[in-house]
Amino acid sequence: RQRYKGRLILSGILNFSLKRGWCRKNAASLVPPPPLKETRIRALSLYEAKQLLHTAKRMFSGECLPACALMLYAGIRPYEVRRLTWNRINLKSGLVSLAPNHTKTGGSRHVSILPVLAAILNQAGSMHNSGKLVCPPNWEKKWRDIRRQSGILRKKGWVQDVLRHTYASYHLAHFGNCSLLQKEMGHATPSLLLTRYLNMDGITPITGAMFWTHGLNPPSLLLQD
């Protein structure tokens, strides 16, 4: 994937130079792109997702829970949630509005707040409509401690975008609408969604429904896979 991205960046630079008259041709276009092999990222199991939420609720007086829930139930990227402020979250309209300077792609995105997420965000109370960051001070360290204490993914380590992958996989499993999911994820085409984000291994219609309806139910009530 790094070779693929490297060629793409180089081609963009050469195209810019070509338009400015700094070179005669884009030599990168003469080289076929290397085959892109996407690494399959396993979505969290239902038990793991709930275990992570409950750990976030239990530690640091629950101040990390909203950010955790936004990544898990709205597919907000880690980079985006660090910049997100409470006044970008509108529980009345049911939308999280991400500004262009906060997103990975540089475009604005509006993500639906589903009931399971709304129930968690409502607990923030007085924080609504404020310009304060959703993530508390010293977020990175606290988030690492929460992941460590949750006990999930110990063997293979934490994957940066695993909550976004989990969101996408459970969303499609339960709602079955690829076009809607593509819009929520902010993808221009379905190709990235289908080739990189979706991993339905171990996800059933039952666990898909439970993911979206059993927000803070104790993980002990669920079967650990």
Residue ranges and their predicted role:
Residues R3-I9, K19, C23-P78, R82, ...:
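Basic, Lys/Arg- and aromatic-enriched nucleic-acid-binding interface segment
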Residues Y4, S11, R82, S169, ...:
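Key DNA-contacting residues within the recognition helix of helix-turn-helix
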Residues R88-L95, G157, G176-R196, P218-D225:
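Short, polar N-cap/turn motifs at the start of nucleic acid-interacting alpha helices
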